[in-house]
From Swiss-Prot:
SUPFAM superfamilies: JAB1/MPN domain, RuvA domain 2-like. Zn(2+) binds at H170, H172, D183. This is UPF0758 protein PC1_4100. Residues 99-221 form the MPN domain. It comes from Pectobacterium carotovorum subsp. carotovorum (strain PC1).
């Protein structure tokens, strides 16, 4: 990855804006200090190498931090607080905007919710007639490689929420987001069940590690 000694990330942020910073520089500002004999920039780089990316660092669970040198419980709680702030920021945006007009924000929000789960979780976003998100609900939790989904229960919750449309999502704990034939089959069943109640299924996102696949983008819905 590499970093140039002598750079001052805080000064760079003030002069050029936060968007000018690299992931290493952003993380270094957050960490504030390094370790004895280890510059904070080097520590930030080492952490990003260990976790793979800034996103994976932010969404890692507590057990992953036990082996991370330089990140104690205090830093862990700060990182999780930032992740939760990000999730709430995305939700507030989706509650005010048409979710289908900003699929990237929807995908990022669902990644924050599902990407690092160790079991398959099937989640539904309930939307009003303007495609603003009313709420989300984890409908079903399965094993590491499957989850049993009941379309009628999804329809029932949609009616309770007075939802006009839905966005479906589930994760693949393996990290690979490519949908299976079973994923496509259950999506078709849910679409048909919802149409009987004049509820539209707008998309189904399969969430991996740092990636997702949209059924709508592939023309499957």
């Amino acid at each position: 990855m590499g970093w140039e000694k002598g750079l001052a990330p805080r000064e760079k942020l003030v002069r050029l804006g936060a968007e000018s910073l690299t992931d290493v520089e952003l993380l270094a500002i957050f960490l504030r200090t390094g370790l004895p004999g280890v510059h904070v920039m080097q520590l930030a780089e080492d952490l990003l190498v260990q976790f793979g990316s800034l996103y994976q660092l932010m969404t890692a669970d507590q057990s992953a931090f036990r082996t991370a040198k330089g990140v104690g419980i205090s830093k862990y709680t700060q990182i999780k607080a930032i992740a939760e702030l990000s999730r709430r920021l995305f939700f507030s945006r989706l509650a005010k905007e048409d979710a289908m007009l900003n699929p990237q924000a929807t995908g990022q929000y669902l990644q924050l919710l599902l990407s690092r789960r160790e079991r398959e979780v099937f989640l539904v976003l309930f939307l009003d007639n303007q495609h603003h998100v009313i709420r989300h609900q984890e409908m079903f939790v399965g094993t590491i490689n499957s989850v049993e989904v009941h379309p009628r229960e999804i329809v029932r919750e949609a009616l309770k929420a007075n939802a006009a449309a839905l966005i479906l999502a589930h994760n693949h704990p393996s990290g690979k987001a490519e949908p299976s034939q079973a994923d496509r089959a259950i999506t078709e069943q849910i679409v048909k069940a919802c149409l009987l109640m004049e509820i539209r299924v707008l998309d189904h996102l399969v969430i991996g590690h740092g990636e997702y696949v949209s059924f709508a983008e592939r023309g499957w819905i």
